[in-house]
Every structure is written in C-alpha cells, then in structure tokens.
From Swiss-Prot:
GO terms for biological process: carbon fixation; L-methionine salvage from methylthioadenosine. It is an enzyme of class 5 (isomerase). The active site is at K94. It catalyses: 5-methylsulfanyl-2,3-dioxopentyl phosphate = 2-hydroxy-5-methylsulfanyl-3-oxopent-1-enyl phosphate. The modification N6-carboxylysine is found at K169. Has no RuBP-carboxylation activity. The lineage of its organism: Bacteria, Bacillati, Bacillota, Bacilli, Bacillales. Belongs to the RuBisCO large chain family. Type IV subfamily. It holds the Pfam family RuBisCO_large. Its EC number is 5.3.2.5. This is 2,3-diketo-5-methylthiopentyl-1-phosphate enolase.
Length: 406
C-alpha cells in the first residue's frame, strides 16, 4: 500500500503526552475514531487508517517553558487524489488551525511523484537558454516602475541589460496597467534585448509578471508564449501551487516559471505553526513546476536564518525524480556579498539584485558590471583587492556597500 509521510513539529507543555497527540492526528485526519468501531468496520477501514511512523519527543525547548517534538505520520494514498490541494487538505487542513503544529516535510511515494511535473526546464534548461554554464546567473529587478510608462521601462531594461545581467524580472507589484500593458512589455522588451545583444554579444532574458484573475492566467500565459516571452514571473502563493502546476503542465505555454515568495511569510514565519521554508519554497515549489524559486538570503535586508535558507537550497537541488529548481537567494543583495553567496550556494544559484544594481553610483550599468566583475574574480581565484584595482565599477560598489565576510 502506497503511503505519504508527513512530518510535523509540535509545540507543547512538558507534561503533554506527545504520543497520544500523534495518534489523535493520525486517526483524526483519516478514519476518525478507531477503538469504538466494530471489528467489521475496522477491517474495511484498515487500508485508510493513518499511523504514527515516528515520534522524537522534546528534541528542542521552545519559548515560555514549552517544548518541541517531531512527529511523522503515514497517510494511505488511497485517501486522496493525486494532486497537491488534496494532499494539503488531508494532512494539514483542519490541523493547521491547531496553532501549535508546523508541517516541516512531506515524503511522496514514487507512484505519487508521477503526478507532479516538476520544472519543465530546471537548472539545466535555464542554463541552455542563457548560454551560461560556468558561474552563477545574475538577475536584476525593475525598480520604481509603478506609475511609469513604457518609455521608462524600456530605458530601465536597456540599462540593466548593458550591465551584463542574465535575467531581468518585473517587480512583483507591477500588474496590468494602461501605462505598461502586459503584451507591450513583452513585445518592446524583446526589441530592446535584441538590440543590446547585437551591441554586446551578451544575451539577457526578461521574466514578465503573469497577473490577473485566476481563470485568465492560462490564456495570458499562452499569449505570452505566442509573443515570444522568455519567462514568467509568478506570485505563486497569492494564487496557489496547483495553479502554477497547471501552467507548468500546459504544452501551449512551455515557458520557465519564476516563483516569487510574496505572501509566503504569512505561512512560514512562525516557529510554531504553518509550513517550513524548505517545504514550501523548496520542495513544493519544485514539485509544482517552479524552474526558479526566489527566497530571502541569510545576509540581506529580509534575511532568513541560515538553516532555513540552506534548507530551501537543498530542497531545490538535491537529486530527485524531477528536475532541479534554480535557487534564487534574494533581498538586499549587493556585490560585496558575492564571495559569501558563492561559497555557501556554489555555482548553481541565481544572484538576484535590485538596489545593489540600481543604487550603484554609476547607475544600473555600473551595478551590473560590478557584480559580473566580482563573480569572475571568485570563479578565477583572483583577489578582490586586485580586481577592484582594475574595475572602477567594483571599486565604487565596495566603497558604497562594503564586503560581507564570514
């Protein structure tokens, strides 16, 4: 019998019976009561009964004299259909209302994984699209675009591309606007990036923000593909993982999907309830089809604890039956962080910068060149001091922001 394993962290009083609570969860989310059932009913329902797989009691103290224990429960896959909404409703539906239970991991069976597409492109496919195989990718972000028209957006796009970035993404709060319509951003963006490629020989891809009502998204994404869009930025947690999966599975779309973590903080930030960062921004994003997953880095302006950030990274890149998702540590990234980013996340991640590019004293071109310069220095084992002597853009960036050293 195929089973799904769900692991929870329970926050509780020292004298609370954790094993009993685990049994209540296993039964309450499957067959309900058990001891009061007649034998015939038990035989009929046995294949639907949840069971406690493992309990690790009091592995960590919590605040206010409370403790935390870890519980793993096995759920028969016969209980739910092969989709993420059914899984989450079963293993964490009403249980999420408890307030002292955090879902930290899900282990899917090989049979169930066949219903989850994973990334269409993944790390390997994205690298083929960019033509970059030997370093982290560099991404920049449109900034201050609310209320601006296409003239301003085109100029921002051009300057960022001339700085040598590999990706440029829309701001996640840029929605459909008569000043900068979705389709115009794609068409005009393609023209600008074609021009910069012809000028520099460097290819930059543009991730346009897919927005609108849920039932409009598929048609808009298909239109984006028809117009030759490079990739889609998607606020997955405003819409739902299943919506992203449906976009990833559509053969008429076939565009890389960049999953933004907006809204996820409401689901992950508490140590006592919600989801773990690694599960939501890592594993579930990956299984639902995210080619790139953005998350706060451990060093920037909205820093995650290292354990959580590295947990997301591992969930994105560990070997599995689906392709790997490109991890994108973000928020407050500047050139002085690059050596630490590359030490901690290796080559297979995307360095994502907004203010670290636009806030450069020489503008977005200087910001991009500063990032590219320090990335190259780390790749080739050059000293940062020597590199700053030969690159004024990097020197200006480090004078402004300094270096993060561990």
């Amino acid at each position: 019998m195929s089973e799904l394993l769900a692991t929870y962290v329970l926050t509780h009083r020292e004298d609370e019976q954790v094993n009993r609570k685990a049994e209540q969860i296993a039964l309450g989310l499957t067959v309900g009561s058990w001891t009061d059932l007649p034998q015939l009913k038990k035989e009929q329902l046995q294949k639907h009964k949840g069971r406690v797989e493992k309990v690790t009691e009091k592995f960590a103290p919590a605040e206010n004299g409370l403790y935390q224990s870890e519980v793993t429960i096995a759920y028969p896959e016969a209980n739910f259909s092969a989709d993420i909404p059914a899984v989450l409703s079963t293993i964490f539906g009403k249980l999420s209302l408890d307030g002292k239970v955090k879902l930290v991991d899900i282990q899917f069976s090989d049979r169930f994984k066949k219903s989850l597409p994973g990334p269409v492109f993944g790390i390997d496919g994205i690298r083929k699209k960019t033509g970059v195989f030997d370093r982290p990718l560099l991404m920049s972000i449109f900034k201050g675009v609310i209320g601006r028209d296409m003239t301003d957006l085109k100029e921002q796009l051009r300057l960022q591309a001339l700085g040598g970035v590999d990706f440029i993404k829309d701001d996640e709060i840029l929605f459909e606007s008569p000043l900068a319509p979705f389709e115009d951003r794609i068409k005009e963006g393609k023209k600008i990036l074609k021009e910069t490629y012809e000028e520099t020989g460097h290819r930059t891809l543009y991730a346009v923000h897919l927005t609108g009502r849920t039932f409009e998204l598929r048609d808009r994404a298909r239109k984006a593909a028809e117009l030759g869009a490079d990739a889609l930025l998607f606020n997955v947690f405003a819409y739902g993982l299943d919506v992203m999966q449906s976009l990833a599975e559509d053969p008429d779309i076939r565009l890389p999907i960049m999953a933004h973590p907006a809204v996820s903080g409401a689901l992950t930030s508490s140590p006592e309830y919600g989801f773990s960062h690694s599960l939501l921004l890592g594993k579930l994003n990956r299984y639902a089809g995210a080619d790139l997953s953005l998350f706060p880095s451990p060093y920037g302006s909205v820093a995650l604890p290292k354990k959580d950030a590295f947990g997301i990274y591992e969930a994105c890149v560990k070997e599995d039956s689906v392709q790997k998702t490109f991890p994108v540590p973000s928020a407050g990234i500047h050139p002085g962080m690059v050596p630490v980013l590359m030490k901690d996340f290796g080559l297979d991640h995307v360095i994502n910068a907004g203010g670290g590019i636009h806030g450069h004293p020489r503008g977005a071109i200087g910001g991009g060149k500063a990032f590219r310069s320090i990335i190259d220095a780390v790749i080739h084992g050059e000293s940062i001091q020597e590199k700053t002597a030969s690159c004024q853009d990097l020197k200006a960036a480090l004078e402004l922001w300094g270096r993060v050293v561990e």
